[in-house]
Every structure is written in structure tokens, then in C-alpha cells.
A protein has these predicted regions:
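Extreme N-terminal signal-anchor transmembrane helix of membrane signaling/transducer proteins, especially
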Residues: 2-52, 295-303
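Cytoplasm-proximal transmembrane signaling helix
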Residues: 20, 24, 28, 215, ...
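Short, hydrophobic beta-strand elements of compact beta-sandwich sensory domains
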Residues: 179, 191-198, 263-290
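Solvent-exposed, extracytoplasmic
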Residues: 98-111, 188, 192-230
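Membrane-proximal, non-catalytic sensory/regulatory domains of signal-transducing membrane proteins
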Residues: 151-184, 210-214, 218-219, 236-270, ...
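Extracytoplasmic/periplasmic sensory segments of membrane signal-transduction proteins
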Residues: 4-5, 52-60, 64-160
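Juxtamembrane interface helices immediately C-terminal to a transmembrane segment
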Residues: 20-21, 38-57, 61-68, 89, ...
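Extracytoplasmic/periplasmic ligand-binding sensor regions of membrane-associated signaling proteins
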Residues: 110-111, 122, 128-197, 202-205, ...
Length: 326
């Protein structure tokens, strides 16, 4: 009789283990499927959030460039208006122009900290106020051949302000952006106003923006960046430029740089190309962290479920065991 009882107990224990195993396998499978689905949506959500963050950072840089241009254009219009509002007699002779326009040019140059502010006359001479020669009042010069300059010619072609791309000024030996505007009085051309702003001003504004953003000029050279190491002309930026040409404005792409995968996006801002780039590892780091946390949670839940289900199965099979032994 004792032997039969032991056999029955072994059978019941075997049933408990098998039922517990089946229940646990079902639970484990369900938890794994749930974990995979949850991770997929978490990964998608985190990835989209990372891309949106990068897009927002690039838009900050775009707004910075647009505000920089808008500020300088407003300044140019204000100066044009002050000169055009002078009595016509103040603008008919070179001496009158020097005496009446000269102080205005110097005042405006000081107010915006420009490198040069000048008025190119139709006879080829230019009234020039220079930061490098601040002690002197603006003087009239005829050795700069202004009629051949792009800022002079383009300003005469348009009724609006002409803005040059950043370029290396041969006299200043530094990169500048020129804002120019033709000035008319009573329907007659007085001259072309020019303002040279150092591109360093834009560089400082871009450097203060968040994210790894940078600006290419029309020759595809970086002249402004949050990371000044990118200004090194020896760095090959063709991978990101080629990827941008393929994908277009505000479309993300991956590219290789120094053997590492990077994620980037670009957009046109006037004549510039503004880009933001980040290591794919940095973008994926929160995703991998979330995956690790979810794996730990699934393992803990599986272990807890195995133990819990075993005791539940044991409890509900206990009456059956008592009947069989009784």
C-alpha cells in the first residue's frame, strides 16, 4: 500500500512539473513576444524623438542665420534712408558728400561694429569709413576700382539689398559678407552703399547654438561651426555633401566618416548649406539602454512567473493528490 502511495505521489509530482512547465513555456513565450513588440515601438519612438531633436537643432541654426541677415539688412535700409533724406545740395559735390555723408558712415560703422562702411559713387570713387583706420574721418578714394566689384554691379541691377556670400577680402585678408544697396535721390542715382560684416560674427552666433551644426559656403567649405575643429580645411566633408544631394532638405541619411557611421541632415539657407551631424552611436545609445532595461524586466518577470505558476499549479493539484492517496 505504501509503495502504491509513493508511486501515486511521483505521478502527481510529474503532472505538477509538466503542467507547470507547459504553463511557464506559454507565459515565457507571451512575455518574449510582448517584450519584442514593446521594444519595437519604444525603439521607433526613441528614434523619431532623436531625429526630431536633431531637426529642431538645425532649425535653430537656420533661424540664427536668417536673423543675422535680417538684422544687417535692416541696418542697411536705415543707413540708406538717412543718406537719401539729406538735402540734395548735400549730395551734389564730392566735398559735400565727404562732409555730410562721411560722419553718418562712421557713426553707423561704430553702431554695428562693421569692418567697412562706404558709398561708391558713379564716377568710380568711394567714400570709405574703415575700422582699421578709425581715427580718421571717411576719405574719398579712387584706387579701389569699385565699378568692377560684384557688390556694386549687383546692387544696381536690383531695387533691393544685395548680399554677397562669405568671401575672402583681398585687402582685409579675412572673410566678409557684404550688404549693398543703390541709393537714389529724386530719381537720380547717388551711389551704392556697401557694408562689410566679418563672417566671424556669424561664426560666433553659430558656435553658440546647440548641437553639432555647421555652415558650408557656396564653394562647399565650412566657414561657421559649433565645433571649430570642423573649420580645418584638410577635413574631407564630401560624404555628407554627397548624401545631402541625394536626400534633399531635412531628410536624414547615414554616411561614413573616419570609419564610423554618422547620422546627418542638411538644408539650404540662402546661398549656404546648413547641416547637423551626430555619431550613430550617440543616437542609438538611448535605444540600446531601453532595450537592456526591457531585457532585464522580461527576465525578472519570467523568473517570477515560473515560481508563481509552479506554486499555483501545486496548490490546485493538491486536492487531487489527497483524493488519490486517500
Amino acid at each position: 500500500m505504501l509503495k502504491i502511495t509513493k508511486i501515486k505521489r511521483k505521478i502527481m509530482n510529474s503532472i505538477k512539473i509538466k503542467l507547470s512547465l507547459i504553463a511557464n513555456l506559454i507565459a515565457i513565450f507571451a512575455l518574449i513576444v510582448l517584450g519584442i513588440v514593446s521594444f519595437y515601438f519604444t525603439k521607433t519612438s526613441l528614434h523619431e524623438a532623436a531625429l526630431k531633436n536633431q531637426t529642431d537643432l538645425l532649425k535653430v541654426t537656420q533661424s540664427t542665420v536668417e536673423d543675422f541677415r535680417s538684422t544687417n539688412q535692416s541696418f542697411t535700409r536705415a543707413l540708406e534712408k538717412d543718406i537719401a533724406n539729406l538735402p540734395y545740395q548735400s549730395l551734389v559735390t564730392e566735398e559735400n558728400i565727404i562732409n555730410n555723408v562721411g560722419p553718418i558712415l562712421k557713426y553707423y560703422r561704430h553702431s554695428i561694429n562693421a569692418l567697412n562702411v562706404y558709398l561708391g559713387l558713379t564716377n568710380g570713387k568711394v567714400l570709405l569709413s574703415q575700422k582699421s583706420n578709425d581715427a580718421k574721418m571717411p576719405e574719398l578714394r579712387d584706387d579701389l576700382d569699385i565699378k568692377t566689384k560684384n557688390w556694386y554691379q549687383e546692387a544696381l541691377k536690383t531695387n533691393d539689398i544685395f548680399v554677397t556670400p562669405a568671401y575672402l577680402d583681398a585687402n582685409l585678408k579675412q572673410y566678409v559678407i557684404t550688404y549693398s544697396k543703390a541709393i537714389y535721390k529724386d530719381g537720380k542715382i547717388i551711389g551704392v552703399l556697401g557694408i562689410d560684416i566679418p563672417s566671424e560674427d556669424l561664426q560666433e552666433l553659430v558656435a553658440a547654438t546647440p548641437g553639432n551644426t555647421f555652415l558650408f559656403d557656396r564653394e562647399n567649405k565650412i566657414f561657421a561651426a559649433t565645433n571649430k575643429e570642423l573649420l580645418n580645411p584638410s577635413i574631407d566633408h564630401s560624404p555628407i555633401l554627397n548624401a545631402y544631394k541625394t536626400h534633399g532638405n531635412y531628410n536624414f541619411f547615414t554616411y561614413g566618416l573616419d570609419g564610423k557611421e554618422r547620422l546627418g541632415t542638411c538644408t539650404k539657407v540662402f546661398t549656404y548649406t546648413a547641416c547637423i551631424s551626430e555619431s550613430a552611436d550617440i543616437i542609438n545609445k538611448p535605444i540600446h539602454k531601453a532595450a537592456f532595461i526591457q531585457v532585464i524586466i522580461v527576465i525578472v518577470v519570467v523568473i517570477f512567473s515560473v515560481i508563481l505558476l509552479y506554486f499555483i499549479v501545486s496548490k490546485y493539484l493538491s486536492p487531487l493528490a489527497a483524493i488519490q492517496t486517500g
